[in-house]
Each structure stands twice: as C-alpha cells, then as structure tokens.
C-alpha cells in the first residue's frame, strides 16, 4: 500500500502552473486554428448559424475577458440567457464555444510539452512507418491464440461533472483555470433544471467537442495509469480480508502439494500461474482484457475493476458492463471486424514403415469476418439501399455534377473495400461493392432521366469497374511510440499506441 500511495503522489506531483494567463494570448487561438496543436485536428468553432472561426471575434472576446465584470455578471446572474443578455443570443452562444474551445487548447499545451521535454537518453522511440490496419490482426493472432478468456468492458463515464474537474486537479494546480472549467460545466448542467447530468454531458459534447475529448482522455489516462500499476502489483498488494487470506493459504498448500508430487515444477511456472499473461486493448470507448487463467480469476478482476471505479473515481458502474466469455466459444467486435478464435479440425496422416495412422487434432485459428448485416444497415441508413440490401438511388446527390457523384460513390466504395479487405471471407465485400455500384448507376440515370440499362450501355460497365477499383491509400495505422513502464524491479511493460490517420464515417459507426 505504501508503494501505491507513493506512486500515486508521484503521479499527482506532475502538475502544471500558470495555465490561466495563456487564455489572454491572441496568438494561441491563431496558432491552434491555423496549424493545429501537435498534429491534432484544427479548431473549427461552429455556432448555431454556421458562423465559423474568426480571429476578430476572438480578439473581441479577449477584450471582454479583460473586463472584470464579464464573468462576474455571468456567475452572479445565472438566469441571464447564455452568458449574456437575451438580445445577444448569437454572440453569447458563440463566445461560450470560443471560451470552452480556447480552454481546451490551452490546457493541451503543457501536456504536449511534457512529452517533448523528455531527456535524450530517455527519448521515446518512434516508428514513422505507416502500416495498414491489417497488421493488427497478425499481432492479435500471435497473442490471443494462447489465451483462454476474454472480457468485454464498456468503459463507464462519470455522471457527475465535478469528478472530471477533480481529476484535472492532479495535473493542473492553477485555481483560476479550474474555476473556469467548473463555470463551464455548471453552466451547461444548470442551463435547464430538467436536464440531467448525462444529458448535459451529451449536450456539452455536441457543442464543445474538443473540450469533451480532452476531459474524456484525461479520465481514461488516469484510469489506465493506475490500472496498469494494479496489474503489475496485483501479487504484491496486502490482503484486505480474511477470506482472501484463507484463499491464499489454501493456494500455498496447493503449491506445496505440487512441489511434492512434481519436483521439477519450478517456481517460475507457479509464478506464471499466479500472475498470468494479460493483454489490454482499448478502442471506441470499449476495452478488451484477455488473459490466460481460470474463470474464477476473471471474475476477481471484474470485481477489482468495479471497486476501483467506485472507490477511486467515486461512481458506481453496473456489473453488466463487463462481460466474460471463453475465447474459444465466442467472437468479439473489434474496429469493425468480428474476430474469433475457433478450433478447426485437422486430420494428419502419419506413415511409419508399413503402418499408417490417422491423427485427428484441433488447431486454433484467428478468424476475422465483416459484419454484413451491420454494414448493410449503415448503407440503408445513408439511403444507398433498402433494409434488405436492394440498391436505390441517392436523390439528394442528383444536383451534383457527374464527376462529383462518381467521386463520392467511388471514395466510399474504395474506403470500405480497403478497410475491410482483411476479412477472411470476401463475399460480403463484393456484395457491398455491388450495392454501391448499382446505387451510383441509378443516381446518374435518375439525374439524366434515363434507365439504368440505357445509361450503362451508353457509358459501358468497364468505366465504372475501373473507377471503383482505383487504388487509394486512405487507411493506415502508425506505430507512433512505445513506452516502457517500470514498477517493480526489472519488470517492464511495453505499451503500443496506434493512431488512426483517417477513417470513413460508414466504417466508424460512432461518428
């Protein structure tokens, strides 16, 4: 426990000061808008009237922030409509978004500078080579084939907004900045009395995407940082209850029994049994925890996670958000693929002199398929086909030029085909390609008031086929950095960060 407290204090001591004065620097907004910050997306603030970013409005906002009664009046008179008088609704809506986005931009700076200021001898190695998303699956095949159980985790989100502010207190020791963040969160949560905390979070996410992404990433970073520590120190933590103590004694007796029955059973093997190999993968607000061990051990880790969220982050999560499945008898959804590790029968014939033997064995194979029903549902929602997969025209695109229509359909088709080409079964991909190709032909025929047959005879089917098979490298993953964490002695943990460069809306259903 002393190690945990010391590690926690060391983690909390990395605080940043003097963040609030940066909000008054004009160049911060211009720099973030023109170039982005450390490779992130450029800031584009959109108001209710589709008015985009304006440096002049930022300058006016900074001048208003210098006025002492600007925020004071907003705090003392919360019933006023949206930070300002109800007559200036547009400016109040726009100013509130600029303030929140500017706060997120400024707070990101010290976190980015901390990564860039590491010593040369401890510099994080970077791999600038681009790799396809399909390189992930050989990695999973190499790691998951020897595991037994898989836990699907829906990462919970704090319902109370004050928890997010408390998490930032560990990193930022700037009281005015934290007060400003509280002001924004309370402003959105108290806008209407009937809005619950979860609805206020969704409303905040809709209007201030950058701020919500920063708060969510801070929460996930804090959760994973201590989760990794608990993983490394799970066998070293003190026993908290008598039941666990008796369980440890019973396990020690089993170890002695193994030592008597099997003298060659080394301590290293027993340590591997006590502390089995685990792999943790997080994506799209979900996580996968795969390990080699018993079902009872996975249930214990489930209880650990629930108690960890409850006692450290002060909110309760439902146990149903963590599903435990046997890896050999279930499939899991990972980045648009349905992956599984089935056991395939294999018949081997062995010839020894005049005798031959047939050996029936089973081998594990990492299989990835495309969820056809799900993707057809997304195409149907985007009005490319019916719910049963019958292609239809896209009337909203008939006002575009022929080249724009072909370009849009071709880009969607190439993106889907390139992203899901790692599937072991290509039949679904050809069906999606057929739907988009025929939907494009129907759209062009509708625009020219002709039939699909006449249109295809005039242009030729080879033109569409050549257009849809044009290669375009749009999806790639970058192995940007690996970090070595050292918690106890010489044990280290290698963590890979995968940055998705670009992804299509149809491929990513969360967008």
From Swiss-Prot:
UniProt-listed InterPro entries: Domain_X, Maturase_MatK, Maturase_MatK_N
Subcellular location: Plastid, Chloroplast
Entries under Pfam families matching the protein: Intron_maturas2, MatK_N
GO BP: any one term: RNA splicing
Gene Ontology molecular function: any one: RNA binding
Main localization category: plastid
Statement: the UniProt record of this protein carries the keyword Lyase: no
Origin superkingdom: Eukaryota
GO cellular component: chloroplast
Record key words, sorted: Chloroplast, mRNA processing, Plastid, RNA-binding, tRNA processing
Function: Usually encoded in the trnK tRNA gene intron. Probably assists in splicing its own and other chloroplast group II introns.
Family of this protein: Belongs to the intron maturase 2 family. MatK subfamily.
Protein name as it appears in the record: Maturase K
Gene from which this protein is expressed: matK
């Amino acid at each position: 426990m002393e190690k945990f407290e010391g590690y926690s204090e060391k983690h909390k001591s990395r605080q940043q000061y003097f963040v609030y004065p940066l909000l008054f620097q004009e160049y911060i907004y211009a720099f973030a808008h023109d170039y982005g910050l450390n490779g992130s997306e450029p800031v584009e603030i959109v108001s209710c009237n589709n008015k985009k970013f304006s440096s002049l409005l930022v300058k006016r906002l900074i001048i208003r922030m210098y006025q002492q009664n600007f925020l004071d009046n907003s705090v003392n008179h919360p019933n006023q409509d949206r930070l300002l008088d109800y007559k200036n609704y547009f400016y109040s809506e726009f100013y509130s978004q600029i303030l929140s986005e500017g706060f997120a931009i400024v707070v990101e700076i010290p976190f980015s500078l901390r990564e860039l200021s590491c010593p040369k001898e401890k510099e994080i190695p970077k791999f600038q080579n681009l790799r396809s998303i399909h390189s992930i699956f050989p990695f999973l095949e190499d790691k998951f084939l020897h595991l037994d159980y898989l836990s699907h985790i829906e990462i919970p989100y704090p319902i109370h907004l004050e928890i997010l502010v408390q998490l930032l207190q560990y990193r930022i020791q700037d009281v005015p900045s934290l007060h400003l963040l509280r002001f924004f969160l309370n402003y959105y949560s108290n806008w209407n009395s009937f809005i619950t905390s979860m609805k206020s979070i969704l409303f905040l996410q809709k209007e201030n995407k950058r701020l919500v992404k920063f708060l969510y990433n801070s929460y996930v970073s804090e959760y994973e940082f201590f989760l990794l520590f608990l993983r490394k120190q799970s066998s070293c933590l003190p026993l908290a209850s008598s039941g666990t103590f008796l369980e440890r004694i019973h396990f020690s007796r089993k170890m002695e029994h193994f030592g008597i029955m099997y003298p060659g059973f080394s301590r290293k093997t027993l340590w591997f049994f006590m502390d089995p190999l685990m792999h943790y993968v997080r994506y799209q607000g979900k996580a996968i925890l795969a390990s080699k061990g018993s079902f009872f051990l996975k249930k214990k880790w489930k209880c650990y996670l629930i108690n960890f969220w409850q006692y450290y982050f002060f909110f309760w999560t439902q146990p149903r958000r963590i599903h435990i499945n046997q890896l050999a008898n279930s499939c899991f959804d990972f980045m648009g693929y349905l992956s599984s590790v089935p056991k395939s029968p294999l018949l081997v014939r062995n010839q020894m002199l005049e005798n031959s033997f047939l050996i029936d064995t089973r081998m594990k194979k990492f299989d990835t398929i495309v969820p056809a029903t799900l993707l057809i549902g997304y195409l149907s929602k985007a009005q490319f086909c019916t719910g049963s997969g019958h292609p239809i025209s896209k009337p909203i695109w008939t006002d575009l030029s022929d080249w724009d229509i072909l370009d849009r359909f071709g880009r969607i088709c190439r993106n889907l085909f390139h992203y899901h080409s790692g599937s072991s079964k290509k039949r679904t991909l050809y069906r999606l390609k057929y739907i988009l190709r025929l939907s494009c032909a129907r759209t062009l025929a509708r625009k020219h008031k002709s039939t699909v047959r006449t249109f295809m005879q005039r242009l030729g089917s080879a033109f569409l086929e050549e257009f849809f098979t044009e290669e375009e490298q749009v999806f790639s993953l970058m192995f940007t950095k690996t970090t070595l964490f050292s918690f106890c002695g010489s044990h280290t943990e290698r963590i890979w960060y995968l940055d998705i460069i670009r992804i299509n809306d149809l491929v990513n259903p969360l967008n």
